[in-house]
Amino acid sequence: MFLAQEIIRKKRNGLALCSEEIQFFVQGITTNSVSEGQIAALGMAVYFNDMNMDERIALTTAMRDSGTVLNWQSLELNGPVIDKHSTGGVGDVISLMLGPMAAACGGYVPMISGRGLGHTGGTLDKFDAIPGYQTEPSSELFRKVVKEVGVAIIGQTGDLVPADKRFYSIRDNTATVESISLITASILSKKLACNLDALAMDVKVGSGAFMPTYEASEELARSIAAVANGAGTKTTALLTDMNQVLASCAGNAVEVKEAIDFLTGAYRNPRLYEVTMGLCAEMLLLGGLASNEADARAKLNRVLDNGRAAELFGKMVSGLGGPADFVENYSKYLPQSQIIRPVFADMQGYAYSMDTRELGLAVVTLGGGRRKPGDALDYSVGLTQVCALGDKVDSSTPIAVIHAQSEAAFAEAELAVKKAIHIGETAPEKTPEIYAYIRASDL
């Protein structure tokens, strides 16, 4: 028998907690036998004194086991259960292509995603732009679509990781969100509750990333790779660039359109292609669906070129309540804003740098993102044709096209976009889309 206050005292004094102490405390979070004040105190103690890898693994697995852990055995799936998670960015539409691509190569992708908050977009918000699509289906329907289609992208159900929900809301109110140990446990407990065979983790770096510096992003990526592998899930973390918008657009309906254009081959943004292929190839390798990276990329290109990935996206949409002809006729279903107009830079030159976070906040200002949880969204608004770093811009080449519902909203977004995209006389040095892979062998 443990006492919550003694566990807090031990961590306050900089000592390591044993797994039984951590399990006891997490159980208390779930059953409400540990008070809000005690949870806040432990969060602050961890924030200042950190946790070693054994503690992080114990916290992650205890939180994972605080609710339902999905079981796929009864479905007799004939392939690995694989997934990816991103720390969030702007124009990060990867999940919409990656899920069907991995499924078309023989994987099963039960992706539980989140909504956007602050400057980052949420995968679920993009699916909410599709009429009829159920982001909160019954567990029976979720399992049915995973088995029959190979991919289902939905929201977190109430019985998954209840400890994280309570802990996170208290951390948010007590300034302990920015702890690498607690971020690691929060992210991974939700993913590992899906009982995955393998996970590819996309940790963003740069002006649109959650972590402020490359070093902090790398520390988080290493922590996630170490803890996930330590908890028994084959995991690789990729450090990817978020110093500019990832796709050519940012918003909800506009990103769904770009995802379908990518899957059908109508248009593939080269940066988006590189990061999507890097993550998806890693999923195939970890899941045993490819023998090496070249083999994985060849398989992925095949399912893009033969239309199989686009077909599975369509089947997932209709399986979860959306229109059966969505891929073929998406323009009929996606909402469109009142004003669609380009914005031009005040000088000619090259797109030299971007404050990606500010571009994400411009989408929020238009009504396409949330200032606080629960805010209603306008799925039609956003940015399209966003220039890439190094692009030449002048009076006839826009730096972006704004989709707005009013002149006032357009004017506000225009100012924000001009301020966020810096024009220089020369093109900047090219940076890689993927900075590093952190595999189990690198830890």
From Swiss-Prot:
It comes from the Bacteria. The keyword Signal does not apply. Pfam families: Glycos_trans_3N (PF02885), Glycos_transf_3 (PF00591), PYNP_C (PF07831). Coiled coil: none annotated. Pathway: Pyrimidine metabolism; dTMP biosynthesis via salvage pathway; dTMP from thymine: step 1/2. GO terms for cellular component: cytosol. SMART domains: PYNP_C. It catalyses: thymidine + phosphate = 2-deoxy-alpha-D-ribose 1-phosphate + thymine. The enzymes which catalyze the reversible phosphorolysis of pyrimidine nucleosides are involved in the degradation of these compounds and in their utilization as carbon and energy sources, or in the rescue of pyrimidine bases for nucleotide synthesis. GO terms for biological process: pyrimidine nucleobase metabolic process; thymidine metabolic process. Homodimer. InterPro entries: Glycosyl_Trfase_fam3, Glycosyl_Trfase_fam3_N_dom, Glycosyl_Trfase_fam3_N_dom_sf, Nuc_phospho_transferase, PYNP-like_C_sf, PYNP_C, Pyrmidine_PPas_bac/euk, Pyrmidine_PPase_CS. This is Thymidine phosphorylase. Gene3D superfamilies: Nucleoside phosphorylase/phosphoribosyltransferase catalytic domain, Pyrimidine nucleoside phosphorylase-like, C-terminal domain, Transferase, Pyrimidine Nucleoside Phosphorylase, Chain C. The keyword Transferase applies. Its EC number is 2.4.2.4. One of its GO terms (molecular function) is thymidine phosphorylase activity. It comes from Shewanella baltica (strain OS155 / ATCC BAA-1091). Keywords: Glycosyltransferase, Transferase. Belongs to the thymidine/pyrimidine-nucleoside phosphorylase family.
